[in-house]
């Protein structure tokens, strides 16, 4: 599956199926180590790609996955949002040994969404911040439609600073750990915490085909 969501003169954004997951995971891992570490061996990186790919397959049935491609059909960005069933172990369990449900006041209306595999290429001559905002908006869109939607994520510490400056109010659950070559922090945000970011940048995706994609994935 590959459905066009948005198109401009620099790139196209698609909603894609699980057949793209391996390429997405490889892109994310490669970009992370390109930014943060030059000391990992090829074997170590390949093993991480394999492990993360298998993890992503376990999320695929209730995930919405987005990729951005340039005019040469090269991946330049991606993100995945997963509606969590509270049974499958998330990265936050495995990396930090914590259960986010111990920190969130759950009600019968609560729904939980894990955002991950978020990366934008460092080798593009476009406004990466605009692509960054669009991809993040696609990910939080279904969360914000819920009565009591919660975002759960593990975010690079520098990226988290940018997200917070852009208006997202996140709650840190634990101090950072090294993951994929950088300090990574476990966070969550409720609907109120997402509100400022959502309303500031909803105009970025108003003309996109996001509603159709959301309805299909619900």
Locate the predicted segments by residue.
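Terminal substrate-recognition subdomain of acyl/acetyltransferases
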Residues: 1-49, 54-57, 144-218
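A broad, low-specificity signal marking well-ordered, structured residues that form hydrophobic/aromatic
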Residues: 11, 66, 79, 113, ...
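A short helix-loop-beta-strand connector motif used in the catalytic cores of GNAT acetyltransferases and
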Residues: 55-67, 88-89
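Short connector loops at helix/strand junctions that flank enzyme active sites
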Residues: 60-63, 76, 108-110
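Conserved beta-strand in the GNAT
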Residues: 67, 73-83
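Short, flexible loop/turn elements at secondary-structure junctions
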Residues: 70, 83-85, 119, 191
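Acetyl-CoA-dependent GNAT
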Residues: 81-87, 107
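Acyl-donor binding region in acyl/amide transferases
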Residues: 91-170, 174-177, 181-185
């Amino acid at each position: 599956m590959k459905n066009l969501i948005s198109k401009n003169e620099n790139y196209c954004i698609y909603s894609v199926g699980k057949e793209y997951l391996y390429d997405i995971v490889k892109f994310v891992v490669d970009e992370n180590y390109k930014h943060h570490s030059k000391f990992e061996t090829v074997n170590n990186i390949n093993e991480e790609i394999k492990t993360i790919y298998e993890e992503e397959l376990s999320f695929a049935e209730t995930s919405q996955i987005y990729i951005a491609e340039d005019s040469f059909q090269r991946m330049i960005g991606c993100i995945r949002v997963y509606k969590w069933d509270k049974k499958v172990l998330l990265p936050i369990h495995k990396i930090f040994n914590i259960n986010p449900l111990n920190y969130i006041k759950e009600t019968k209306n609560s729904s939980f969404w894990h955002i991950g595999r978020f990366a934008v290429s460092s080798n593009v001559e476009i406004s990466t911040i605009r692509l960054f905002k669009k991809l993040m908006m696609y990910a939080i869109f279904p969360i914000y439609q819920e009565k009591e939607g919660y975002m759960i994520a593990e975010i690079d510490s520098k990226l988290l600073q940018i997200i917070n400056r852009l208006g997202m109010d996140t709650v840190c659950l634990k101090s950072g750990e090294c993951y994929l070559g950088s300090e990574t922090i476990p966070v969550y945000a409720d609907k109120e915490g997402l509100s400022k970011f959502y309303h500031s940048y909803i105009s970025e995706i108003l003309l996109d085909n996001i509603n159709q994609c959301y309805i299909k994935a619900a």
